[in-house]
């Protein structure tokens, strides 16, 4: 495939390995195991086990680095076509233009040639050194220097300064600056100051100061420039090397100096070490042509003051350039400076991991125009190689490469004192796969190098982004490398096996010859990137892989590899060397010698260091070191022999390991010497290895001498120690083989075998098959000894030994054979033989006893016990055990079935049958089993009968159950269901006794007692006739209570029936009443005992109930009086809002009532919102027709308001209550509610009698007569157009005239004085009556009667007591009208009631219309919908949260249940019989009530019968 092709074909995948946990525990062992397969590919990938996930240990916040800049299109088209000269020679510029996609024609090739020659070609000439060929070079500018190796190792490593910690000597000193020569400040040195060398012009060579002005002969400089500080160093051979001390480039130096505020008089210089050289005579002649003519064309170098004709330079310059100019030699010298990074330039910005990741992800997302995680790896790979080959697109990326882990921290946990590690981190910190640990493992060669070689022993970190790449290279010293990707996107690798390394180098040289001509070791500089397809097209085998997070990639010795990153990631890499690497390491040194490349460490020193301590070496490593050492000694002998043949006999010992690396390097091949080197007395600054003895110097051989580390006699001694160490395994293996095979006929003792195993462990022999056999033999022998000791101790333990640990007779014999076959002697064999003899004797005795059956059970049992003490299972012992078990089973059956024995359970019987199946068969056993089975069958049948009786829905009478129990008594088995049936029958008898006792008592039974008996009777599995009677009584009692509840309780009432019937116990506490009203949970109501203050036992005594009720009446009255005083002291909501008081009224809604719309309760004197409570209706009284009935007076309007806290029930009429009492008399059950109802009735009748008595007084009768006369006079007078006014009589009621036709309709809607109006019964147009009432209010005057205080006070007290009664009485209404007539009309309340009624009617009509529309829509759709909910038609107060708002509907239901008994009516109007009686006198009307047809005396005997012991004065 051509390099310029757009399609990239991925190479085949490299091998991928997934080790098991057992394999993964030995890293280098596993790598050695896969090496035969993976080495053929050069690289491989290893996926650790899924559970191996090391934590990321880098301190992210403190991790800062500066990446390198990479440009992807470094190999360009011209280089690919063979270079500038080749293209010009073959006239291929048109081909170049075609490859650059320019259109043919138009002389594009010529234009490209001119641009290339002007811009790029000078750089290529500089790179190749062609512009220095004709230069009259100084002695150091020779050909050898041009090809001298540029120190870089991997160049990126060289650009990073070594660690501040223990650096390995050679590398650390190589990168450290030379020892600083003496520096002098010219200003401070008077001798130097006299020289006056500040201006332009030639300077003395010895001072090393150069003139800055390159246009020396032109005087057009605009101002003085500060000359750069330069250093002239004299080399050992008299050479002079000019170096700039500034690390910046020339342009940067110029820019910095031109802006520097420092004066141009301060210089730093280095004094020469040797002043014996001849003085340099400066002349203004061209260094190329050695002529001085045409001085206007002479160009002065700003670095070395050499002169050049601009036309002599290659390529020539058209004119003298402006600014700083350096000659080719100075440019070459500057570029050869070791401290400068070769390869990719360093970026200027410092990144953190977060900022670099944001930059990397942003770049990739912008470049690919899609999310970074969605870009396919194949697409990135193709795009990368397209960009590498492209010259049109200049894509620049940054790569955080070669970051020193010692300074920035490793990605793996490291065991150091900086921070405490968790147990999980500690595990990974010591793992062999931790890249900080792997290079220094015991099997690794690098662990024998003390110094931390950066990049080899100390890992480096790599932070990559998309397209950031690493070029084709092999590792230093051809070592292994391992790379772990901690996290991030994949890293793509390409690898070439070591067998094809030279082939790859040849292809590279063939494709880019110019680069390799100038730099033979180009592939060692990590700056060469070539398309894998190009290599494959030339026959180089290439493999690839994508390394994902958590995976390892291993490169093998001399395996070329390269790759790039798919995106933002973080990797870590390190080198390691194993025993198999040693031959490759030696070959690498020879290869470095040919390339004159520096070594990272001395291979000879490493071998000798390992050979000096052979006992510390791994056995395989010792064998490999011995082999390498032998080759090295042979070569050393040959080289030293060549020295003798040359006549060099002088020698001295030298500890080369103590010398810095740069002081023991061969000046020819740059190899680091260790075993020996050749030096010269006259040239002390240089030495050579023994392979280049002819390249040291020109001095005589007599002046040269050998510097050696070891003598030729010491090297064989070291070699011998290695051999002993390497062959020690063979000696040991021979001993082990003889011991295991018993070749000499003598079994070794256990101690001898343990000594051999201990020797292998101490000398770290490899885990071979022979060692495993020895360990297995020892393990087996120790197990046999332990088992034999256990056998002996088991006999001593006797019957207390664990049964599961016994061995069989066959196992005992096999165990003895095993001990005899082991290759070691054990004295426990005799003990085992003795036990075997005892067991065989016992076996013979047991056989004899079994042959003479039936034997006595005692004899069999004794034999069995003796066998157990032996500790060995004998087959005959099992037969003895079965015979003993048979005898025991028969005895147990006999005891169980004996008549005198305790009855056994069914489980016991079944257990005996199951156990009998496992005993030895015999006729006696069969007979016993048959008897057991028959008995068990009968018992189960009766048990099933009892179970059916207990579980059946149809309960059986007690007589039936008694018969079943009697028949089951004859079975000698304990039957649980029969026993349960007995217990149920006993409970039934006890229950019947309790029923008889409670029914025959002095009093009727209480409902709670009956309910308890019913609940118990229902749970009994016995048919009870009495239960049905009790259930009927309880049902009747519940029905009566439900009927009473409907009569008294409002819908959703928060009170219980008993609470309503009893006096209000908390009438004096406003807060308690109010909180009770707000309570919605019925489960929190007070119990009966709390209401009456009696115990459960006292509630069964009717006398106690009556006494408690009487006490409750008194407490209720006292409480309400206290509450009235408290509430009267509260400010009125109708008063001024500025009135401030700590005690304010609170409505049932929880808010403070204020302003118009507030009503005051006539009983408790508290204030409420009119919209939150049920209010009276003004026109609640029935009306005559306009022609027959007079108008009502204002005192007859219904303005009386009782709050829901005082009016707790519906307050039925006395007639309804008497009907309930009649039904109660027929109940044979006592209820707390019934007795409370009797007390309430007696209290109401008592109050009614007192009220009638008060109304019958003469003064009261006279007042009532006046009201009757006034009513008659109003009836007889004609109706005027305007309502008349009178000072002492009530105003006429225009509503009675104008809307008399509507009164029957209104009367039908008003029940019990309640204000609830049903929208079905009110026409939408009604409302004129309310308007008439509103217009009449300003003309109302009063009072119409004058009530003396002596008359008013008793009536008000009676009114108070009557309002406390939860019963409606006509006398209450009469007293109310009389009191109202004696007071002025309450206009504020009347207005409030009118406004509330108007608002209510308006809301009812709106809801009625909406409901009618909904009903019509449903009918139109054809659906048969139910009638809308009643709550939707009721007014706002009905739908409120207060239960009283919905009592109207329940009152209608109450009428139907009580036979048409309606709510209480007010005092009859004129024209009725009662009115006629009142006109003639009130006495007849007060003498009888509408409900007096049922005298109370007929009801009281029930209550009196309940308490015959009470004295007459306490009875009602």
From Swiss-Prot:
Residues 427-593 form the JmjC domain. It catalyses: N(6),N(6),N(6)-trimethyl-L-lysyl(4)-[histone H3] + 3 2-oxoglutarate + 3 O2 = L-lysyl(4)-[histone H3] + 3 formaldehyde + 3 succinate + 3 CO2. Residues 142-151, 232-242, 1294-1304, 1420-1437 have a biased composition (Basic and acidic residues). Residues 1404-1419 have a biased composition (Basic residues). Fe cation binds at residues 473, 475, 561. Residues 24-128 form the ARID domain. GO terms for molecular function: DNA binding; histone H3K4me/H3K4me2/H3K4me3 demethylase activity; zinc ion binding. The modification Phosphoserine is found at residues 246, 260, 276, 852, 856, 1318. 2-oxoglutarate binds at residues 399, 481, 483, 491. Its main location: nucleus. Its EC number is 1.14.11.67. Residues 1444-1459 have a biased composition (Acidic residues). Residues 142-186, 216-262, 1274-1305, 1400-1516 are annotated as: Disordered. Its cofactor is Fe(2+). A zinc finger (PHD-type) spans 283-333, 1144-1209. GO terms for cellular component: chromatin; nucleus. Belongs to the JARID1 histone demethylase family. Histone demethylase that specifically demethylates 'Lys-4' of histone H3, thereby playing a central role in histone code. Does not demethylate histone H3 'Lys-9', H3 'Lys-27', H3 'Lys-36', H3 'Lys-79' or H4 'Lys-20'. Demethylates trimethylated and dimethylated but not monomethylated H3 'Lys-4'. Participates in transcriptional repression of neuronal genes by recruiting histone deacetylases and REST at neuron-restrictive silencer elements. This is Lysine-specific demethylase 5C. The gene is KDM5C.
């Amino acid at each position: 495939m051509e390099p310029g092709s757009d399609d990239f074909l991925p190479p085949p995948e490299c091998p991928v390995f997934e080790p098991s946990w057992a394999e993964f525990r030995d890293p280098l062992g596993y790598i050695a195991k896969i090496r035969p397969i993976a080495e053929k590919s050069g690289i491989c990938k290893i996926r650790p086990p899924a559970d191996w996930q090391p934590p990321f240990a880098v301190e992210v916040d403190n991790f800062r680095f500066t990446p390198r800049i990479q440009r992807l299109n470094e190999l360009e088209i011209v280089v690919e076509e063979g270079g500038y000269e080749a293209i010009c020679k073959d006239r291929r510029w048109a081909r170049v233009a075609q490859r650059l996609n320019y259109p043919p024609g138009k002389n594009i090739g010529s234009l490209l040639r001119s641009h290339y020659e002007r811009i790029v070609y000078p750089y290529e000439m500089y790179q190749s050194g062609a512009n220095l060929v004709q230069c009259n070079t100084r002695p150091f500018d020779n050909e050898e220097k041009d090809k001298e190796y540029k120190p870089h190792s991997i160049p990126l490593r060289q650009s990073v300064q070594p660690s501040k910690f223990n650096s390995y000597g050679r590398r650390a000193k190589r990168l450290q600056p030379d020892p600083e020569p003496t520096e002098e400040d010219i200003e401070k040195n008077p001798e130097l100051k006299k020289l006056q060398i500040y201006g332009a012009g030639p300077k003395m060579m010895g001072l090393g100061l150069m003139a800055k002005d390159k246009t020396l002969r032109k005087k057009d400089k605009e101002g003085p420039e500060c000359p750069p500080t330069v250093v002239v160093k004299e080399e050992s051979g008299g050479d002079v090397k000019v170096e700039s001390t500034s690390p910046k480039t020339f342009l940067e130096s110029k820019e910095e100096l031109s802006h520097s505020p420092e004066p141009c008089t301060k210089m730093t210089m280095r004094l020469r070490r040797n002043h014996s050289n001849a003085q340099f005579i400066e002349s203004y002649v061209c260094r190329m042509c050695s002529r001085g003519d045409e001085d206007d064309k002479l160009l002065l170098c700003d670095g070395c003051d050499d002169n050049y004709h601009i036309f002599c330079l290659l390529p020539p310059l058209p004119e003298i350039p402006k600014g700083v100019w350096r000659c080719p030699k100075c440019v070459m010298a500057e570029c050869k400076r070791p401290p400068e990074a070769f390869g990719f330039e360093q970026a200027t910005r410092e990144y953190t991991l977060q900022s670099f990741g944001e930059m990397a992800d942003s770049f990739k997302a912008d470049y690919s125009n899609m999310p970074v995680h969605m870009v396919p790896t194949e697409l990135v790979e193709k795009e990368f190689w397209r960009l590498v080959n492209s010259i049109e697109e200049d894509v620049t990326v940054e790569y955080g490469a070669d970051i020193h882990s010692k300074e920035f921290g490793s990605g793996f946990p490291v065991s150091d004192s900086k921070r405490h590690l968790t147990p999980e981190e500690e595990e990974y910190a010591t793992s062999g796969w931790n890249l900080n640990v792997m290079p220094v493992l015991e099997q690794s060669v690098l662990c024998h190098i003390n110094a931390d070689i950066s990049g080899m022993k100390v890992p480096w970190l790599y932070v990559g982004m998309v397209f950031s790449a690493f070029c084709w290279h092999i590792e230093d010293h051809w070592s292994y490398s391992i790379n772990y990707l901690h996290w991030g996107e994949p890293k793509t690798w390409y690898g070439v096996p070591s067998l094809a390394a030279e082939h790859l180098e040849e292809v590279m040289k063939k494709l880019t010859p110019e680069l390799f001509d100038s730099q033979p070791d180009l592939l060692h500089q990590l700056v060469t990137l070539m398309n894998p397809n190009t290599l494959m097209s030339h026959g180089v085998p290439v493999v690839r892989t994508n390394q994902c997070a958590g995976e390892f990639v291993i490169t093998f010795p001399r395996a070329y590899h390269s790759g790039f990153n798919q995106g933002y990631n973080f990797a870590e890499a390190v080198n390691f060397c194993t025993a198999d690497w040693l031959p490759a390491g030696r070959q690498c040194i020879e290869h470095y010698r040919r390339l004159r490349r520096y070594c990272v460490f001395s291979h000879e020193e490493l071998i000798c260091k390992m050979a000096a301590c052979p006992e510390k070496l791994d056995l395989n490593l010792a064998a490999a070191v011995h082999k390498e050492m032998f080759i090295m000694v042979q070569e050393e002998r040959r080289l030293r022999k060549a020295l003798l043949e040359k006549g060099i006999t002088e020698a001295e010992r030298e500890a080369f390991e103590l010398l810095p690396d740069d002081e023991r390097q061969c000046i020819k091949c740059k190899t680091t010497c260790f075993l020996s080197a050749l030096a010269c007395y006259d040239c002390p600054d240089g030495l050579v290895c023994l392979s280049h003895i002819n390249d040291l110097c020109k001095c005589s051989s007599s002046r040269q001498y050998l510097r050696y580390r070891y003598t030729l006699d010491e090297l064989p001694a070291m070699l011998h120690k290695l051999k002993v160490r390497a062959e020690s395994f063979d000696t040991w293996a021979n001993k082990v083989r003889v011991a295991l095979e018993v070749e000499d006929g003598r079994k070794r003792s256990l101690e001898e075998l343990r000594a051999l195993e201990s020797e292998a462990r101490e000398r770290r022999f490899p885990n071979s098959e022979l060692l495993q056999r020895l360990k297995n033999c020892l393990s087996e022998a120790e197990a046999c000894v332990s088992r034999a000791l256990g056998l002996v101790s088991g006999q001593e333990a006797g019957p207390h030994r664990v049964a599961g640990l016994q061995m069989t007779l066959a196992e005992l014999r096999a165990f003895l054979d095993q001990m005899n076959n082991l290759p070691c002697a054990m004295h426990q064999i005799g003990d085992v033989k003795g036990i075997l003899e005892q067991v065989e004797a016992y076996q013979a005795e047991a056989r004899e006893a079994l042959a003479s059956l039936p034997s006595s059970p005692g004899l069999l049992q004794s034999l069995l016990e003796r066998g157990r003490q032996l500790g060995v299972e004998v087959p005959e012992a099992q037969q003895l055990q079965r015979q003993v078990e048979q005898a025991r089973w028969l005895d147990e059956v006999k005891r169980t079935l004996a008549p005198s024995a305790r009855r056994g359970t069914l489980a016991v019987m079944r257990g005996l049958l199951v156990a009998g199946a496992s005993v030895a068969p015999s006729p006696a056993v069969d007979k016993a089993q048959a008897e057991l089975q028959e008995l068990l069958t009968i018992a189960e049948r009766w048990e099933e009968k009892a179970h059916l009786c207990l579980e059946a829905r149809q309960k059986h009478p007690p007589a039936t159950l008694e018969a079943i129990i009697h028949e089951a008594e004859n079975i000698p088995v304990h039957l649980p269901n029969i026993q349960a049936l007995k217990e149920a029958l006993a409970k039934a008898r006890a229950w019947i006794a309790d029923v008889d006792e409670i029914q025959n008592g002095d009093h009727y039974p209480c409902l709670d007692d009956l309910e308890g008996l019913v609940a118990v009777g229902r749970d009994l599995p016995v048919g009870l006739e009495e239960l049905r009677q009790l259930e009927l009584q309880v049902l009747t009692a519940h029905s009566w209570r439900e009927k009473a509840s409907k009569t008294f309780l409002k819908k959703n009432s928060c009170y219980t029936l008993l609470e309503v019937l009893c006096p209000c116990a908390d009438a004096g506490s406003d807060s308690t009443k109010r909180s009770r009203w707000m309570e919605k949970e019925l489960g929190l109501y007070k119990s009966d005992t709390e209401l009456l203050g009696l115990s459960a036992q006292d509630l069964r005594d009717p006398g106690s109930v009556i006494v408690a009720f009487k006490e409750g009446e008194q407490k209720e009255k006292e409480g309400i009086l206290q509450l009235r005083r408290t509430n009267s002291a509260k400010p009125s909501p109708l008063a001024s809002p500025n009135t401030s008081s700590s005690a304010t009224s609170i409505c049932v809604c929880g808010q403070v009532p204020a302003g118009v719309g507030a009503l005051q309760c006539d009983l408790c004197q508290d204030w409420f919102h009119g919209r939150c409570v049920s209010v009276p209706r003004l026109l609640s009284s029935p009306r005559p027709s306009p022609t027959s009935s007079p108008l009502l007076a204002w005192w007859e309007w219904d303005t009386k308001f009782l709050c829901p806290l005082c009016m707790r029930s519906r307050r039925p009429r006395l007639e309804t209550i008497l009907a309930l009492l009649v039904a109660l008399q027929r109940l044979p059950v006592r209820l707390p509610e019934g007795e409370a109802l009797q007390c309430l009735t007696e209290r109401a009748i008592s109050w009614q009698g007192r009220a009638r008595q008060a109304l019958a007084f003469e003064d009261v009768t006279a007042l009532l007569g006046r009201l009757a006369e006034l009513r008659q006079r109003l009836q007889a007078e004609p109706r005027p157009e305007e309502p008349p006014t009178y000072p002492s009589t009530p105003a006429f009621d225009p509503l009675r005239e104008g809307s008399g036709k509507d009164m029957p309709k209104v009367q039908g809607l008003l029940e019990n004085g309640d204000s609830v109006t049903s929208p079905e019964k009110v026409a939408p147009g009604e409302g004129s009556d309310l308007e008439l009432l509103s217009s009449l209010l300003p003309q109302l005057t009063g009072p119409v009667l004058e009530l003396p205080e002596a008359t008013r006070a008793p009536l008000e007290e009676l009114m108070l007591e009557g309002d406390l009664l939860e019963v409606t009485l006509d006398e209450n209404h009469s007293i109310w009208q009389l009191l109202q007539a004696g007071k002025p009309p309450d206009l504020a309340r009347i207005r409030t009631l009118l406004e509330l009624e108007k608002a209510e009617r308006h809301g009812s009509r709106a809801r009625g219309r909406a409901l009618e529309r909904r009903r019509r829509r449903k009918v139109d759709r054809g659906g048969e919908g139910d009638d809308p909910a009643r709550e939707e038609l009721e007014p706002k107060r009905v739908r409120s949260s207060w239960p009283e708002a919905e009592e109207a509907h329940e009152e209608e239901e109450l009428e139907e249940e009580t036979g048409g008994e309606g709510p209480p009516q007010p005092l009859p109007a004129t024209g009725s019989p009662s009115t006629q009686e009142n006109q003639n006198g009130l006495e007849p009307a007060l003498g009888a009530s509408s409900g007096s047809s049922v005298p109370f005396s007929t009801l009281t005997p029930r209550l009196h019968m309940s308490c015959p012991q009470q004295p007459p004065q306490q009875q009602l």
